[in-house]
Amino acid sequence: MKTIVVGLGLIGGSIALDLKEKKFATEVVGVDLRSDHGKQALDLGLVDQVTGLTQALQGADLVVLAIPMSAMNRLLPQILNEASENTSITDVGSTKGKLAQLVQDHPKRRQYVPSHPMAGTENSGPQAALRGLFAGKTAVICDKDQSAGHHLKRVEAMYDALEMRMIYMSSTEHDIHAAFVSHLSHISSFVLANTVLDMEKNVATIFDLAGGGFESTVRLAKSSPEMWTPIFEQNADSVEHALDAYIGHLKEFQSALREKKWDKIQTQLKRANEIRRVLQSIDDKKKVTR
């Protein structure tokens, strides 16, 4: 199976690496606007070759779009226009609603399978690609009834090869859930980093006092602004709703602190501890489905 990966950063590079090593693809062709990324991907063995998009699409069985959401809006319609009827197309973007609306009336819409592998790190570029990044994680497939069966099966086969468990929902549902479980955590990390940088003018003090808790909480602030700004833009309504809920909890905590209601704070912390049970059940489910 000739597989095209458009965008050779962390996610695209990791997909290319695993599909190549697991022999899911007979050939993995990379496409990237940045020539340095293309060269790095070749040098690292992530892809078999790097070409332009039009050339890559010749005889392609599967196209994986792994580029920033701002570029996705432009490139997905172009790929649908140029791809043969046999080519299956998926994207791995973090938002789905706006993209789904963009191509809903395209004559080749049924060749497209919107998806989102819920995996990643704060790093970017081909050198950030990781073997086994997706194993045991969840891939969300959206609006499956709008995709032709054989194209859906091809994308499902890809995620099987990546050892991911698959769940299905609408694009609208995806964007609401992603705002809470993914986008909000990145915003929290970005804002925490800015708060500390504003208040702690002496970088040495941050270095000396920061412990593991700070490092783990602020880790996502190292994520690419070029990737995340378009995500927030395209999912603005759901993200704003998530922020309203989050800020409400912050204000509730601040009020209890100001009024010295320590029992109320302890109750809030105990309730937050319930996330341990939720996360454990998620881990257990992943083990069962592997």
Where are the language model's segments positioned?
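Interdomain hinge/lid region at the active-site interface
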Residues: V203-A272
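Internal alpha-helical scaffold of NAD(P)-dependent oxidoreductase catalytic cores
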Residues: L133-R219
